[in-house]
Regions:
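Conserved C-terminal helix/tail region of periplasmic/extracytoplasmic solute-binding proteins
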Residues: 301-332
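N-terminal secretory signal peptides and thylakoid transit peptides that target proteins
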Residues: 2-18
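Short beta-strand-to-loop elements that line the ligand-binding cleft
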Residues: 67-75, 92, 157-169
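Pocket-lining segment of extracytoplasmic ligand-binding domains
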Residues: 96, 171-262
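Bilobed "Venus flytrap"/periplasmic-binding protein-like clamshell domains
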Residues: 37-59, 120-121, 130-197, 290, ...
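C-terminal segment of N-terminal export signals and the immediately downstream linker at the start
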Residues: 24-42
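Secondary-structure end/capping motifs
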Residues: 229-308
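Short, polar/charged alpha-helical segment
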Residues: 46-73, 77-78, 82-84, 99-104, ...
Length: 332
């Protein structure tokens, strides 16, 4: 007998695949050529904002993939390095992640921008701007991003901010903020949504709306250099599925939220729905992915956080061919 969970997953898959068909006309797959491989491995981490890759399974099957694996990474804080080690073939991650990994020699390629603005900087009452974090206790899901934000407004991140960090699983900056033990917290979904649901703190920077951050992609799609080089048709089809799923996140957030909960990528439907409603998933055609790489690479280089120049990273470790083709195929 088919379990209720399996049946729900199957029906949800049919529903999502049908919805994707309504959002975009089916591509002429024959024009791509034959798939070099029918296997693809997608990274699985705890960030709800990566929903497009979590709900792309049926779309990947429609593209001809028969073995689709979601892989738990050994180090979800270093997705680019994990893909470079061969743990997965594709994943989305905050733009700084692949740039750092490329600078360190990871054999990966940045392929597309996916969405804007998932991080929010939340502060205790009385703190209204980043400059007021001087001398304050701060924790961050991405310390590097907060370093760039602080430097952007003239703070010395190393000396002006009291960083609160932890390396074991018991470290929970959200609860530290809730208990008033830190003054600010830079978080990615579902943490900002959880704080909002608990009526804690106030947002002083939202990457979705505040410049300059809102003018660039937050998360970008990367792939294994070996996979992209050896399987160009499979790469394009995998990207097509993920970008179609990105459109679904923008057009049908409630459906996508239910799907990622049913498939146990996250537990809270409310947080998932709030994340999908907050994050702009409708910018992948409009924004320039190369501009995002240049923006973050320049700031990392100026802060002596990477050695490679933006020009070197863009020239050697980005590939926009597939994205440009898909922008023409999947017109809004």
């Amino acid at each position: 007998m088919v379990s209720m969970h399996t049946r729900r997953r199957f029906l949800a898959g049919l529903s999502l695949a049908g919805a994707a068909g309504r959002v975009r006309a089916p591509p002429a797959l024959a024009a791509d050529g034959a798939l070099e491989t029918t296997t693809v491995r997608i990274a699985k981490i705890g960030a709800i904002c990566l929903a497009p890759q979590y709900v792309s399974e049926e779309l990947l099957r429609a593209e001809g993939f028969t073995e689709i694996r979601y892989v738990e990474l050994k180090d979800p804080a270093a997705i680019g390095q994990s893909i470079g080690r061969g743990e997965a073939d594709f994943s989305t991650a905050f733009a700084v992640d692949p740039i750092q990994a490329i600078d360190a020699g990871a054999p990966i390629v940045v392929l597309a921008g996916v969405h804007v603005g998932c991080y929010e900087l939340v502060a205790q009452p009385g703190i209204h701007r980043i400059t007021e974090l001087k001398g304050k206790k701060v924790a961050a899901d991405s310390p590097l991003l907060l370093t760039l934000m602080a430097a952007q407004v003239g703070l010395d991140p190393a000396n002006d901010i009291h960083w609160v960090t932890g390396t074991d699983s018991s470290f929970n900056p959200l609860e530290l903020f809730a208990d008033g033990k830190i003054d600010a917290f830079l978080g990615f979904p579902p943490n900002p949504q959880e704080l909002r649901a608990r009526h804690l703190g106030q947002v002083i920077v939202s990457m979705a709306v505040d410049r300059p951050w809102s003018q660039y992609f937050c998360c970008m799609l990367m792939g294994s250099r070996e996979y992209v080089r050896n399987h160009p048709v499979a790469t394009k089809r995998a990207m097509r599925a993920i970008l179609k799923a990105t459109d679904l996140c923008a057009s049908e957030p409630a459906r996508v939220a239910r799907t990622i909960v049913d498939r146990r990528f996250t537990d809270s439907y409310d947080n998932a729905l709030q994340t999908l409603s907050d994050v702009p998933y409708d910018k992948w055609r409009e924004y320039d992915a190369e501009d995002t790489v240049r923006f973050y690479a320049l700031r990392l280089h100026d802060a002596d956080l990477i050695k490679s120049t933006p020009q070197k990273i863009i020239a050697e470790s980005t590939d926009w061919r597939f994205l440009n083709e898909l922008k023409r195929e999947l017109k809004a």
